[in-house]
Amino acid sequence: MSEHDDTNETRVDAQVAALVTEAQDQLRPTAVPARREALDRDEHLIKDAVLRMGSLVEEAIRDASRALQTHDQELALRVITGDAVINEAQRSVTRLISVTIATQSPVARDLRYLLTLDHVMYELERIGDHASSVAKQVLKLAPEPPLRDYIHLPAMAEQGAVLVHGVLRALVDIDAVAAREIAVLDDEIDRMYHETFDEVVALMRADPANVERGTRCIIASHYLERIGDRATNIAEDIVYLVTGDVE
């Protein structure tokens, strides 16, 4: 072997050694806790933001319910304008989740957790939209005498707020058992929706003067029923987070 070959071999060995050292540095135990700490911090920030948004949504439902019962048009307007805040919160947290996934490269349970929170945000935003839609019907119903006190609409709204509060509590506790109970509560909203629909249609048939108010009531009841369905979707997300099972 020539002196030139020896020099080349030495150079290659040095390069290989440098690459090995660099790889070992990247795999040192200190790097893992640092990444874990950053991911934990981001997950904590995201979860807090989701819960804050959930509180806004729950408040919107309760305010829509009060506006419905008291014919409070000003309160209904606040629910409608407040929906923009909920929408912006959803967009902000979605961006944060995307950045966290891109920069932290979460896997397994962490990735499932972030994707679950992203879908929870989507469902909460839609619930906020439904609360706003109920408030818009309140603006049209408020000037007129209530049609049989709107049948079950106030109770449906209150039950919807209870469901949202319940799924947020289950999310905080990561509690699949509590999440599964939400579906049972949603059945009650479904029952009230069908009873309201049937009774309002009967009132509309009995007196054509009830048609416009009755139509508004049916529209509002539809949105309230959807609130229950979306709360159930969040509950199913929590079950998936805990068990990995899709229900």
Report each predicted region and the residues it spans.
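Cytosolic, long alpha-helical scaffolding segments
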Residues: 1-247
